[in-house]
């Protein structure tokens, strides 16, 4: 984090003031987030299980806890049967679900999904967004960044439209047509 410094205002996330966060606090702050990227970022030499477990191992989580949490989260995303597969043996949608499982395995209060459907076909895109909705219903705050108007319009959620760093819209699905130019521009 701290890729950008705000020109005005205060940015607070999960109780951290990002304007004043100290360097030594950044690792702890990052552990409070789950992040899913457009390009999956899976380690090709590791199995599905190990890709997910990696997020726990780097934070020194006990092996016993890893053995409990990884199968649980793989089941949550529908990949329990693929735990021993490698990324190149999976479809794009399955790879994205592995990335999602890895982001969720630490049970973060906030999940940021940055164009999570950018590299998968439209039908799988709806499955991924439905999975994000289910995660949200279970209590995790989900922030999804996307330019896909059609994808956003199928789900009844709050939509904030940002253009060049400025909020230009904040409302529901019914307000999207008003902001359509920002999605198509």
Predicted regions and their residues:
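Conserved ABC transporter NBD signature motif
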Residues: 9-17
